[in-house]
Regions:
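Nucleotide and nucleotide-moiety/phosphate-recognizing core
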Residues: 1-156, 164-189, 279, 283
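A short, conserved alpha-helix in the catalytic core of glycosyltransferases
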Residues: 162-165, 197
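Ubiquitin-like/PB1-type beta-grasp interaction modules and other compact soluble beta-rich domains
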Residues: 202-283
Length: 284
């Protein structure tokens, strides 16, 4: 059983946006695919997407688990219940997020999950970031699924009702920024910014892709392109390859930060990542 996993709630009505948020484009991916990929990188466990019954979803990373929200219009507690129930026996804890968080950083996810890893008695690690509680950028014990389901049946649909019945540790801005990686890579806590309106989306699209470091090895390192690391703007492995004039095909492997190996060009990148591209003769 994995220590942690991810849940993305994708079944919201997107009434303020006026269009389904899951499929909105952001730097070559969709909001939902990026969020799923970031959660997969940060947790190492399965990632569950909770959708409305019959909802169309954009293409998602392989091994994504998709479950239907059994009741329409019941809000986030219903999605939390469905997502946690899908992870029963598969993980001890899950980071739960909405679908519309393009700036969510793996360092933020790991910091929040670490609370549950270090304190068995804690049920929920709840960031209170940028002035607001963030129930859809928080970590929950999988064992809370029956409790959340009971609250839905009682029509007590706000996350605050769940928190009233749990041991909750709240993380304010200071506690989050005390983490060295968050301080360096997400100092403004942009991880919790979501995209609710067309204006939000326009602003999010105007932001540049994350700054990442790229380095080539083996045969790929020959010539000017291979002379040491370089910084590029890229939101996916494919974009990082394109920025160096590299074709990311079956002859090339990428290693993220020296450990996570991927051959999937859609793998999302975050600020501060280092992408090592390896050719076959370098062990790729």
């Amino acid at each position: 059983m994995a220590a942690s996993a991810g849940v993305v709630l994708a079944g919201g009505r997107s009434s303020r946006m006026g269009a389904p948020k899951a499929a909105l484009e952001w730097h070559g991916s969709t909001l939902l695919a990026r969020t799923v990929g970031i959660l997969g990188r940060a947790t190492g466990g399965p990632v569950v997407v909770v959708r409305a019954s019959g909802q169309d979803l954009p293409e998602l990373p392989k091994r994504t688990v998709v479950v239907d929200d059994p009741r329409d219009g019941k809000g986030p507690v219903q999605g939390i219940a469905a997502g946690l129930a899908a992870l029963d026996g598969l993980a001890d804890a899950a980071f739960i997020s909405s679908t519309d968080m393009p700036f969510l950083h793996p360092a933020f996810i790991r910091r929040v999950l670490r609370v549950l890893d270090e304190r068995e008695e804690t049920d929920v690690a709840l960031p209170v970031a940028r002035g607001y509680p963030q129930p859809l950028a928080a970590a929950y014990r999988v064992r809370l699924a029956p409790r959340a389901e009971r609250l839905v049946k009682e029509d007590r649909l706000r996350p605050a009702f769940l928190f009233d019945e749990c041991a909750v540790e709240r993380l304010d801005d200071g506690a989050l920024k005390a983490d060295a990686l968050i301080a360096a890579l997400d100092p403004d806590l942009d991880s919790v910014l979501n995209v609710n309106t067309q204006a939000d989306y326009t602003e999010a699209r105007a932001r540049p892709a994350p700054a990442v470091t790229v380095q080539l090895f083996g045969a790929l390192a020959r010539g000017d392109a291979g002379r040491g690391p370089r910084t590029v703007r890229a939101a996916t492995v494919d974009e990082a390859a394109d920025a160096t004039g590299l074709t990311f095909d079956r002859h090339v492997t990428a290693a993220l930060n020296g450990d996570q190996i991927t051959r999937d060009g859609s793998t999302p990148l975050a600020a501060g990542d280092t992408v090592f591209f390896l050719s076959a003769d370098a062990g790729g």
